[in-house]
Amino acid sequence: MRPDISNIPELPGVYLMKDISDNIIYIGKAKSLKKRVSQYFQSSKNHSSKTRAMVRKIADVDYIVTESEVAALILEANLVKKNRPHYNIDLKDDKRYPYVKVTVNTKFPKIFITRRRLMDGALYFGPYTNVKPVRQTLDMISQIFRIKRCNRRVDGKGKRACLNYHIDRCYAPCNGSITPEEYRNNVMEAVKLFKGETSGTIKELQEKMNIHAIAQEYESAAVIRDQIDALKSLSRQQTATAGNDDSDIIATASDDETVFVQIFYIRDGNMVGKADMSLSWGDATGNIARVTEEFIKQYYQDAPVPPEILVQYPIPEKELVIKWLSEKAARSVQIQVPQRGNKKRLMEMAEQNAQMTLEQSHLKQSDKEQALQALLQLRDALALSTLPAHIEGFDISNISGTDAVGSMVVFENGLPANSKYRHFNIKTVKGIDDFAMMAEVVKRRYTHQKAEKDKLPDLILIDGGPGQVSAAMGSLKELQLDIPLVGLAKRFEHIIVPKDGTDEVVILPHTSEALKVLMRVRDESHRFAVSSHRRRRTARLSHSELDTIPGIGASRKKALLNHFSSIEQIRHASVEELTAVEGISKGLAERIVAHFNKERVENQ
């Protein structure tokens, strides 16, 4: 049934199409609301299939009158962003220039990077074209001002402080170690850096760097040098304004469902960065020029507007969009289609990158579909009640029981989720006992999961035979957890399934995709266990008594051990012998001798 549109005025504004359930399904803007809305209900021969489908669902039309076309364009963009109607072109993954956000409107403010600038009472700095020095500055702020960066709630309930507090990178407001007033003062000191007031901090850092350099502590000096460079880069970005050679190049590539957008950021005539985004076609299937226009309207709501925007094709309402962008930027803005020269070459490069992003998306989708089929096969082969979308794999690595480490890897939808990997330094088992080590690791993992009420895996895979499987099952039974668990032994790739106190062996063809999933999880857990064990062993071997002597870092320790071969020889070396080593000054040699002399006296 056609909605009543007789009372819609012939004025500029925004119209909202609603379905029978009063859901907004499309938002548009018009110079004349009455004329534009009427067009939807006239002959449909010029409408796309999606537009015809949308019109059939329209049960009501609401509208908002604005003072001008530009005001209508701005309101339309804001309403689309807020409501995300089904038939509008939807910017899916909006990767904008980063800002630094300071939540000054909270009791204990945080400082962090964000891609969106909201009207939420917080303080924002940026946008920054280069995020690396911003991250370096935030790391430095953690060291100097000890500002909270984790997501813990600060509710005054006296939580135990996290690691950042113990390494002097946070004042731990979560457990009341600092008052709100003291903490806020610290935050406002840090804020000065983002306001460009960096000269005092840079001067202090340069003095510290010189002290380390004089003491030949070159590694410490290099760290401070990098901090100074980051601050200078941050300051340059903060004070930079758009120059005449600044432009954004927007290119697209598309398939039947999605439009992939590539933006090249050109600043001072040089390419300083790029971003990939994607949009749905909405009701504009096949009309790249219109999709590009909609992208510009959504993207530049809160992204910095350069003097020039280069596009592949002329956009439908170019003059209106230019007027809006120029008002927003408070200067002239141009939208051009490059015809020749360097700009044309850069556009072709952006088009090529957009096409590559499209092809990579197709490959990823194909990988996901193959992984799903493999998981379905695995579910059937092991007679699981649910799809094993979340698999956790365990392995143990040690040398004769020393530096023993257990690993846990996570696969989600058949693919590794690296950020969720964990390693466990073995604590309770002495000597060579892989079974007991496996029992410890599994128990520690799921004791924590049970206590935190975290989601449990759909399947546990143990790298090993019946002994390891039995040990792991024992831990699960102790915790009263019923999680499907299997083992995969390397030699024959037989799957061990514990059932009612016995082990059932499932043999799958080596070509089976289900078996390949388990092998990938098993091999990854083994790799991660070995690498974790090596790190632990290296850390133990590299730690020595020299680490307790001020002025000896990694490079000097290495030089001393290369020269003397052992700590014992260094212990009995004279000042003259020590100064023969590159990087060891007379003062440092005297400190080394004094350290070992003191040790000998204490041991007498």
Curated annotation (Swiss-Prot):
A molecular function GO annotation: DNA binding
Q: Which residues form the GIY-YIG domain?
A: 10-89
Q: Which Pfam families match?
A: GIY-YIG (PF01541), HHH_5 (PF14520), UVR (PF02151), UvrC_RNaseH (PF22920), UvrC_RNaseH_dom (PF08459)
Cellular component, GO, one term:
excinuclease repair complex
Keyword list (alphabetical) reads:
Cytoplasm, DNA damage, DNA excision, DNA repair, Excision nuclease, SOS response
Q: Which PROSITE patterns match?
A: GIY_YIG, UVR, UVRC
Grouped into one coarse class, the protein's main location is cytoplasm
Localization, per the record, is: Cytoplasm
Gene3D superfamilies reported in the protein's UniProt record: 5' to 3' exonuclease, C-terminal subdomain, GIY-YIG endonuclease, UVR domain, UvrC, RNAse H endonuclease domain
Query: Which InterPro entries does the record associate with it?
Result: GIY-YIG_endonuc, GIY-YIG_endonuc_sf, GIY-YIG_UvrC_Cho, Hlx-hairpin-Hlx_DNA-bd_motif, RuvA_2-like, UVR_dom, UVR_dom_sf, UvrABC_protein_C
Superkingdom classification of source: Archaea
Which one GO biological process term can you cite for this protein? Answer: nucleotide-excision repair
| Domain annotation UVR: ranges | 199-234
Description of how the protein assembles with itself and partners: Interacts with UvrB in an incision complex.
| Record function comment | The UvrABC repair system catalyzes the recognition and processing of DNA lesions. UvrC both incises the 5' and 3' sides of the lesion. The N-terminal half is responsible for the 3' incision and the C-terminal half is responsible for the 5' incision.
The UniProt entry's sequence similarity note says:
Belongs to the UvrC family.
Name of the protein in question: UvrABC system protein C
Q: Which species does this protein come from? A: Methanococcoides burtonii (strain DSM 6242 / NBRC 107633 / OCM 468 / ACE-M)
Q: What is the lineage of its organism?
A: Archaea, Methanobacteriati, Methanobacteriota, Stenosarchaea group, Methanomicrobia
